[in-house]
A protein has these predicted regions:
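Short beta-strand/loop segment that forms part of the nucleotide-sugar
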Residues: 31-41, 62-64
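Acceptor/aglycone-binding surface of glycosyltransferases and processive sugar-polymer synthases
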Residues: 60-81, 90-92, 103-187, 220-226
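Hydrophobic helical membrane-anchoring modules
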Residues: 1-2, 20, 28, 53, ...
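A conserved acidic beta->alpha catalytic loop
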Residues: 39-48, 100
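Short, well-formed alpha-helical segments that are part of the catalytic scaffolds
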Residues: 11-26
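Short, conserved active-site loop motifs that form the nucleotide-linked donor/cofactor pocket
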Residues: 2, 33, 58-60
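Donor nucleotide-sugar binding loop of glycosyltransferases
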Residues: 11-15, 42, 103
Length: 226
């Protein structure tokens, strides 16, 4: 089972298209899956957009009316997947952004790497001419600090050059080990890049095998300041 986890806040403009693409992709790439969405107190039409998809695909929505932030939304999704799995060694969590910057077309290769034995596969965003200038500058700065000692020891992950992205697949037994070590303590309430680094480092420490996969992000549908 693959649990596709989407932390969501005010994604009404993109979440429907993303779910449609995920559903279409799994019709061709046959794997058992379930989409878990954490609706983090959205104020737009996110919840209404989700409703019809629950009738045509395996979709479960959690969340509430109080905003908890990205880090705690991811934490809640990981715990939900951990509670639902029956085979943690065989099952996996896929974390994606709900704003469509993470394309479903990369899912088959992520899954193949996982099925080949990787406990964690991190999607590393390819920076090219199509990447917006603010994102290119940020990516250059982030890669610079991962190479700079002593910052490398604080944010770096062996074999991963971009620990700041949110697109990854993780074996659920590894997620379970991380949650057990963390007990009831959730991810810190920090900004998205910091939360992604913290989670990637925690998972990498528990994983036996870590891989990275170059991916092309989509910036043409919705560009955020972050």
């Amino acid at each position: 089972m693959l649990y596709i986890c989407l932390p969501t806040h005010d994604e009404g403009a993109t979440i429907g298209v993303l779910l449609w693409r995920i559903r279409a992709m799994f019709q061709e790439f046959s794997r058992e899956y379930e989409v878990l969405v954490y609706d983090d107190a959205s104020t737009d039409a996110t919840r209404e957009t989700l409703e019809p998809y629950a009738k045509v695909m395996p979709l479960h929505v959690i969340g509430g009316t109080t905003r908890v932030g990205y880090a705690r939304a991811v934490d809640a999704l990981l715990r939900a997947a951990n509670e639902r799995t029956r085979y943690p060694r065989r099952d996996a969590v896929v974390l994606m952004q709900a704003d469509f910057t993470d394309g479903p077309e990369h899912l088959p290769e992520l899954v193949k790497r996982f099925e080949g034995g990787a406990d964690l596969v991190v999607g590393e965003r390819v920076v090219d001419a199509a990447t917006p200038e603010p994102v290119r500058k940020l990516a250059g700065w982030l890669r610079w600090i991962t190479r700079l000692w002593p910052l490398r020891s604080a944010v770096g992950v062996t074999g991963v050059t971009d620990p700041f992205g949110g697109y990854r697949i993780v074996r659920l037994s590894t997620v379970r080990d991380v949650l057990k070590a963390r007990d009831a303590r959730p991810l810190a309430d920090v900004r998205v890049p910091s939360a992604n680094v913290e989670l990637t480092r925690e998972i990498a420490r528990a994983a036996r095998r870590v891989e990275a996969l170059p991916i092309t992000a989509r910036w043409d549908l919705r560009l955020r300041d972050t």
